[in-house]
Amino acid sequence: MAWYDEARFYHIYPLGLTGAPQNNDYSEPVNRIKELTPWIKHIKEIGCNAIYIGPLFQSGSHGYDTTDYKLLDSRLGDNEDLKKFVKDCHKEDIKVIFDGVFNHVGRDFFAFQDVKQNRENSRYTGWFCNINFWGNNEYNDGFSYENWGGHNLLVKLNQRNPEVINYILDVIRFWVSEFDVDGIRLDAADVMDFDYMKSIRGLANVVKEDFYLMGEVIHGDYTRWANNDTLHAVTNYTLHKALYSGHNEHNYFEIAHTVNRLYDMAGGNPLGLRLYNFVDNHDVARIYSKLSNKAHMIPVHILLYTLPGIPSIYYGSEFGIEGNKENGSDASLRPQLNLKDYKDATDKNPLTKVIAALGKIRAKSPALSYGGYTQLQLTNRQYAFSRNVNGENVIVVVNNDDNDCMMTLPSNSVEEYVGALSGERIYAEGGNITVNVKACGGDIYLPLNDVMGEYKPVDYSKVLKEVEKQAKKKVKEEKKDTSTLPKKVRNVPYEEMTVEELQACIIGKMRNNGEVTDEMKRTVMENVYHDSLVNWVESFR
């Protein structure tokens, strides 16, 4: 199996974590990336064995407006500094994947600057999409062009141009030869050309053993992207949404339905559809901020580490930090952190201790990486399932209620289990085990044998006690008003519809499938990206 099948990712947004200036003046490099070195030990301590880091390369602002793909952003240092960071990670057996922003470039990118200077005579006009020298934009370029997400700061690359394809493939070869990177996360993969991505996959298959490609996909049929010809994995936004709303609404049916649908999409094969599971990242609110009852941090993370897929922790969330978008800005989601402020967190911070335990449990159990999934019991407030591979059967239980509960579950021919979090030994009787699941908690029951060994209990009651000091209140989220959506939608191709028409279509198709909750409406209304909405509406069957 490949390394990524057993990966436990730690996600770093380096410009934020290191406190780099928001705008790049392209001055002399400042080695801020060295500030990440102490984090390597911490990342290993919490049981992660892979880092997704980015964006990294020279850009004008947030990192996604690339200026130079072969030069580390000068706000972070120079190429030698990045080489050292990756080498230090590899010494600790930690893999590293970079953020590959290959859908669009920044306005300072050399080829776009040539178009600005030479207009129709530029040899690079074919590198970009839909350049119109009769148009204009807010920069008064005297021409218009296709962008990403309505932002002219991000210039869409023509991904069917052989020169563009070869240029990006050369960038990837350079990243491997120069930095020894282990894979790439493709930004905005859900709006990238499929043949373009297949060319990237073709290179990935030969450029380095087990070179990993993971794509950012918001909605749709994930198998269109994650397959043997395109990408190895995609971001699991569907589960991300279900994990927090399923707890906020005390509705484990939403989570189980999501898991079953994704598992069926993969043909019932746990490795048939590799998904990158997460509860927060650099684009969405922190999980601690999204949860109405902060005690649900425990069952949420138990599920993150035990459901099919590859788990990921976003830097700082293991400490329980908060973060919401403010005035449309992502800055509060990408804060500067000093690891010294969280010294000995794996001993002193109860939440960090639980997440570290989950990482180590995941590392020791092949069933949690490779095992099949079977739902055992489901109510609004309790959920149990098993993961099984090569005779190893693991049972996972979670409870979102404020009271303990008893659950009786099939033992699957295992005579004795041990709770990996509680340390509790459970004996099977009559082919079943009966377990007491703590309020706002859960456990992972592993077969007691010599291979798995003994487990020291993790007392997550301290997390719950801290939460009890806070008033249980709903996270303040403005409900998006759907009354502004058009009553009638034009009979035109989806590509020609407005954002509002696409949103109305999606909500209408959701209604055809059943009740549409406020959470579902809000998810639709928060997506204002035309290409993403087109992909979403086309995913309904």
Where are these regions (language model features)?
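Active-site-proximal helices and loops of the catalytic beta/alpha 8
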Residues: 86, 90-92, 116, 177, ...
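Conserved, mostly hydrophobic/aromatic
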Residues: 12, 43, 53, 69, ...
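Structural preference for beta-strand elements that scaffold enzyme active sites
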Residues: 7-11, 50, 93-97, 183-185, ...
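Carbohydrate-interacting/catalytic domains
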Residues: 1-52, 58, 88, 259, ...
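Substrate-binding/active-site clefts of carbohydrate-active enzymes
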Residues: 1-9, 13-49, 56-178, 200-206, ...
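Basic helix-extension-helix modules of the SAP/HeH family
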Residues: 482-541
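Active-site groove signature of glycoside hydrolases
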Residues: 104, 168-194, 277, 281
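Active-site clefts of carbohydrate-active enzymes
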Residues: 270-292
